[in-house]
């Protein structure tokens, strides 16, 4: 499956690999995807047991919520064991942590292809989501995005106190002002690389839903199509922000009709509700409506 065939995902909720029973909470919250975490959320002594439980959960996956797994970094054998265990028909994608550059993506792509072949799955079925957690990875977002056709949902993740804050050295603030340029630059690289459905993150203050909404709205305004989340209470807010409202959809439908009527008269542009619009705006409107009809799981 090429990356441009991946469904849009508004919300991707992390679930500890030691707590696979929490998948029910993720589904109840309305998450478009759950990310079972085998990396940071699992102590070293529990990696093996968590891997088995996550693999079983992937094998049982059903319903509308996509299942992703964040594996361990490629610099250790656990990553290989993770991929072999979790690559099953129910796996939508893999989050690849600590990506250093395109070579890591190429290696992960080859490993996934081998695992898919081993399981009798079509090559490229499993999406690959590189996590840009170093200054070098952030600077190389374009090359990383082009490193494998299965790359999807790529974006800047600038949570408070995380790897990116340490790597870049900025001081986090609720306004997101200090990461605005960074998120914008990564988004431009991702779009230029042809990677659809860019996903941002991460809001770590569980109880501050107003702050979450403001951050999500800022990311949507930049051009991101979804966000990673760490708590079920964040999912409804994120889903709302990254979904077009009925009023927006109705306006887009009217805009398309107005442009079509103008074109039938031989006009290239037309005044619509006080604005000058043309085919470029109509194409954008058609894309939004198509995405809304397609839904998060296609």
Language-model regions, residue ranges each:
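Expand to "…catalyze enediolate/carbanion chemistry for C-C bond making/breaking, isomerization
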Residues: 1-298
């Amino acid at each position: 499956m090429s990356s441009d065939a991946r469904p849009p995902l508004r919300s991707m909720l992390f679930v500890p690999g030691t707590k696979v029973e929490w998948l029910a909470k993720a589904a109840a919250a309305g998450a478009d995807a759950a990310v079972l975490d085998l990396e940071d959320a699992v102590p070293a002594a529990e990696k093996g047991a968590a891997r088995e439980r996550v693999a079983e959960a992937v094998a049982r996956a059903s319903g509308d919520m996509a299942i992703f797994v964040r594996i361990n970094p490629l610099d250790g054998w656990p990553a290989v064991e993770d991929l072999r265990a979790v690559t099953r028909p129910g796996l939508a994608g893999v989050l690849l942590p600590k990506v250093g550059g395109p070579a890591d993506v190429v290696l992960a792509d080859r490993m996934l292809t081998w695992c898919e072949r081993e399981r009798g799955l079509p090559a490229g079925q499993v999406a690959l989501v590189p996590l840009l957690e170093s200054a070098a990875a952030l600077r190389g977002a374009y090359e990383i995005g082009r490193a494998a056709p299965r790359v999807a949902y790529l974006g800047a993740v600038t949570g408070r106190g995380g790897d990116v804050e340490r790597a870049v050295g900025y001081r986090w603030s609720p306004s997101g002002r200090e990461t605005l340029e960074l998120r914008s630059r990564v988004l431009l690289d991702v779009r230029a690389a042809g990677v659809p459905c860019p996903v941002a993150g991460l809001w770590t203050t569980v109880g501050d839903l107003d702050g979450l909404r403001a951050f999500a709205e800022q990311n949507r305004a930049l051009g991101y199509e979804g966000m990673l989340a760490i708590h079920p209470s964040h999912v409804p807010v994120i889903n709302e922000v990254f979904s077009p409202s009925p009023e927006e959809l109705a306006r887009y439908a009217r805009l398309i009709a107005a442009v079509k009527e103008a074109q039938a008269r031989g006009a290239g542009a037309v005044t619509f509700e006080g604005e000058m619009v043309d085919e470029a705006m109509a194409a954008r409107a058609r894309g939004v409506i198509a995405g809304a009809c397609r839904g998060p799981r296609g």
